Amino acid sequence: MRIFTIKNTTAFLNYSMSLASSELILNADQSIYHLHLKPNEISNNIITVGDPDRVAEVSAHFDSIELKKQKREFVTHTGTYKNKRISVISTGIGTDNIDIVLNELDALVNIDFSHRVLKEKFTQLNIFRLGTSGAIQANIPVDSILISEKAIGLDALLHFYDANHLL
């Protein structure tokens, strides 16, 4: 049994308790519902992009591509780059879509789909966001490459996560 805290509430995870079909929604082929992916089809190193067309632009730089899948706006390519396995996936627009993608990626690596239970050892994914943004500073020219150290959301999504350590 694992104990963790979400927003001042202690939760107990029972690894032997099976997840209901409403808590883990799988397609007929046992892939996760929205992304249409199976656990072995993603890397632990994942680049997310908003625009589905940008997935092919990123994976064009891979040395090889082993998987190309699409369901709705969610496009995924998995392959290798400099001998490292990597996946790139589109999230679409908005925090609600990003939330779906992140939750389903987490399920892919931390839930045993065949028994519908949590794995005893959790896997942490390395997720990188690659995208475009406008700038309000006049000294930043169009087409500049920027690396953000922090970001802030003005929506309510973070209220559902234990994010106090981020602030």
Name each region found by the language model.
Residues M1-S16:
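N-terminal amphipathic/basic-hydrophobic helices that include classical n-h-c signal peptides
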Residues Y15-L167:
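Metabolite-binding pocket within alpha/beta catalytic cores that recognizes anionic/polar moieties
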